[in-house]
UniProtKB/Swiss-Prot annotation:
Keyword match Transferase: yes
Protein name as annotated: Hydroxyproline O-arabinosyltransferase RDN2
Cellular localization per UniProt: Golgi apparatus membrane
GO molecular function, one term: hydroxyproline O-arabinosyltransferase activity
Catalytic activity reported: trans-4-hydroxy-L-prolyl-[protein] + UDP-beta-L-arabinofuranose = O-(beta-L-arabinofuranosyl)-trans-4-hydroxy-L-prolyl-[protein] + UDP + H(+)
UniProt KW Nucleotide-binding keyword: no
Enzyme class at the top of the EC tree: transferase
Paired cysteines (S-S): none
Domain of life of the source: Eukaryota
Membrane topology classification: Single-pass type II membrane protein
Listed transmembrane segments: 13-33
Known EC number: 2.4.2.58
Keyword entries, A-Z: Glycosyltransferase, Golgi apparatus, Membrane, Signal-anchor, Transferase, Transmembrane, Transmembrane helix
Length: 360
């Protein structure tokens, strides 16, 4: 039997997504509540979604989740995936963890040399030119393909990224049909209502139904993400094709795509500020679960941040585009935040214990 071409599959996905987009008219009503955030980094409740009081402590059994991250076969992605997988294996078996299986969704279309090291499923990239130079558009397309072909034992899925490091064992932060997500300060649906309304019409409800999130990190029930993923792909591509949206959202366009797609399906997220930290802006790892090292960390020898200027001491993943960072990176000088020092120590531990670290 002949295999359908990637372009045909995309057309089918887009067709079903347009139907979904036109049919979904749900308005989910939530009681108002004041924003709550615990000083010790616990639950963060936004007026958008609040977990009802009577279910906060009713969890009686484990609900394992499958970890899935999308990646390319670029060396830059490979060394990050190796570090991420190392810490997943260390944290998975510790008390408090509900981490299940692991899949690297490789959207380069062909196998690479990490297939035997990291559990991997190969999917097709978008046809050439369709991403318009925005490689992140491959992420929703990768999830669409993976969800169609994968046999996932767990009921929940954590959507993660290569530059995530698990600081401690991660429990399932979702509750039933409410996924758990990290609130990003720069995702602002209300401030961008004029643009958001192009994809989330008024008849669907208030723009505050669109959560201030991206697709990662998110822990979500697999039947929900299976419904959302085609719409996420469709909306993201429509956003990229619209010059006004593309200019306004830039590199976070696909994050808005996921947020809008979720809202179109009536899915609301429990917002967890303790889900993740991002050095150097977040200075402590206490009570946090994931380090996201997306920002460069630059300091002088006095331990002062020199962001925007290359520091006398620095750690920036972009310094290692062509190969992995060397083993035993120098630790930051005194005065640098604990989160930065912890990140470097964790990178060093992983690189010291991963065989053939320098050969990618």
């Amino acid at each position: 039997m002949a295999r359908a071409s990637p372009l045909l599959m995309i057309c089918l996905v887009l067709g079903s997504s347009f139907a979904t987009y036109n049919l979904v008219t749900m308005i989910i009503h939530y009681g108002s509540a004041d924003s709550l955030a615990t000083e010790d980094g616990g639950l963060f409740f936004d007026p958008i979604v609040e977990m009802p009081e009577h279910v906060k402590n009713t969890k009686t059994s484990k609900a394992p989740f499958h970890i899935a991250l999308t990646a390319t076969d670029a060396i830059y992605n490979k060394w990050q995936c190796r570090i991420m997988y190392y810490w997943y294996k260390k944290q998975r078996s510790l008390p408090g963890s509900e981490m299940g299986g692991f899949t690297r969704i490789l959207h380069s279309g062909k196998a690479d040399n990490l297939m035997d090291e990291i559990p991997t499923v190969v999917v097709d990239p978008l046809p050439e030119g369709l991403d318009r130079g925005y490689v992140v558009l491959n992420r929703p397309w990768a999830f669409v393909q993976w969800l169609e072909k994968a046999n996932i034992e767990e009921e929940y899925i954590l959507m993660a990224e290569p530059d995530h490091v698990f600081v401690r064992p991660l429990p399932n932060l979702a509750f039933g049909e409410n996924p758990a997500a990290f609130p990003f300060f720069y995702i602002k649906p209300k401030e961008n209502e004029k643009i958001v309304r192009k994809y989330y019409p008024e008849e669907n409800g208030p723009v505050t139904n669109v959560d201030p999130i991206g697709n990662s990190p998110v822990i979500i029930r697999k039947d929900l993400i299976a419904k959302i993923a085609p719409t996420w792909m469709n909306i993201s591509m429509k956003m990229k094709e619209d010059p006004e949206t593309d200019k306004a959202f830039g590199w976070v366009l696909e994050m808005y795509g996921y947020a809008v797609a979720s809202a179109l399906h009536g899915v609301r997220h429990i917002l967890r500020k303790d889900f993740m930290l991002q050095p150097p802006w977040d200075t402590e790892t206490f009570n946090k679960y994931i380090i996201h090292y997306t920002y460069g960390c630059d300091y002088n020898l006095k331990g002062e941040l020199t962001y925007g200027k290359i520091g006398e001491w620095r750690f920036d993943k972009r310094s290692h585009l062509r190969g992995p960072p060397p083993r035993n990176l120098p630790l930051p000088p005194p005065g640098v935040p604990e989160s930065v020092a912890t990140l470097v120590k964790m990178v060093n531990e992983a690189s010291a214990n991963i065989p053939n670290w320098d050969t990618l």
